[in-house]
């Protein structure tokens, strides 16, 4: 089973490439961002139940970008976001994998869970330093990078990938495709594991999003490049030439 890591900025055709591989090859598709979206969706649902006036209804699939523009502004202040992020960290800690430096306490009455003072203060400072308009996309960036990677465990999302990948070693799939490589340490892991690295590039798609996860990754010797400068059929043909 060949391990493939895809990289590309928004509107480069990276997601289209991933979908084509998943539909036309015997492959597993893995999103590094899936646990981020899952945790935010579940945390939002819980906060909506507590305070529907602030955390208005957002369907689970909206966090996947299905039927919703994830850059739509949300009417949240920084305290709202801190509360939401605390809920996501508790969910990740219990449902996925413990996060280094994140300690969770429970109240004696009612079993209410909350972050210990040290991780809470780190979270509060990080969110208070963000002055962007909040949206689902910005919440994803905040949780994935500004909070988990920068504050607690740089390799957390990579560890979750590795656990999933190990489950498929020895399977009869031909490809295991990581579809959303956005950070240097993720790509360094890919190369260390002997993965095939494919960059999908398209002229005229420079990102206006200044967050580090939307900056794009450098192309290094040995990487493959798909230049998406034509029709869908031409893109599919280029994918076929690489994988067949």
Swiss-Prot record:
This is Deoxynucleotide monophosphate kinase. Gene3D superfamilies: 1.10.238.70, P-loop containing nucleotide triphosphate hydrolases. Allows the synthesis of deoxyribonucleoside triphosphates necessary for the rapid viral DNA replication. Phosphorylates dGMP, dTMP and 5-hydroxymethyl-dCMP (hmdCMP) while excluding dCMP and dAMP. The phosphorylation of 5-hydroxymethyl-dCMP represents the first step in the replacement of cytosine by hydroxymethylcytosine in new viral DNA genomes. The keyword Kinase applies. Keywords: ATP-binding, DNA replication, Kinase, Nucleotide-binding, Transferase, Viral DNA replication. Belongs to the dNMP kinase family. Coiled coil: none annotated. It catalyses: dTMP + ATP = dTDP + ADP; dGMP + ATP = dGDP + ADP; 5-hydroxymethyl-dCMP + ATP = 5-hydroxymethyl-dCDP + ADP. Pfam families: DNMK. Its cofactor is Mg(2+). ATP binds at residues 11, 13, 15-16.
């Amino acid at each position: 089973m060949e391990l493939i890591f895809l990289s590309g900025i928004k509107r480069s055709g990276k997601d289209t490439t991933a979908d084509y591989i998943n539909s036309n090859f015997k492959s597993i598709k893995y999103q590094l961002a899936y646990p981020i979206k899952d945790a935010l969706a579940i945390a939002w649902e819980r906060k909506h139940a507590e305070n529907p006036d602030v955390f208005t209804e957002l369907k689970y699939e909206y966090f996947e970008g299905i039927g919703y523009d994830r850059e739509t502004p949300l009417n949240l202040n920084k305290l709202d976001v801190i509360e939401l992020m605390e809920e996501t960290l508790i969910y990740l800690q219990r449902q996925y994998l413990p996060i280094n430096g994140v300690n969770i306490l429970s109240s004696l009455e009612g079993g209410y869970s909350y972050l210990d003072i040290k991780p809470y203060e780190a979270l509060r400072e990080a969110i208070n330093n963000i002055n962007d308009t909040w949206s689902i996309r910005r919440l994803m960036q905040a949780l994935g990078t500004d909070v988990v990677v920068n504050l607690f465990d740089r390799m957390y999302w990579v560890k979750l990938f590795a656990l999933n990948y190990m489950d498929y070693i020895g399977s009869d799939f031909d490809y295991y495709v990581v579809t959303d490589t956005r950070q240097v340490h993720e790509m360094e892991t890919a190369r260390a594991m002997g993965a095939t690295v494919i960059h999908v590039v398209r002229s005229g798609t420079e990102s206006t999003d200044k967050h580090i996860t939307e900056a794009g990754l450098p192309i290094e010797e040995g990487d493959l490049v798909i230049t998406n400068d034509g029709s869908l059929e031409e893109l599919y043909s280029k994918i076929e030439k690489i994988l067949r």
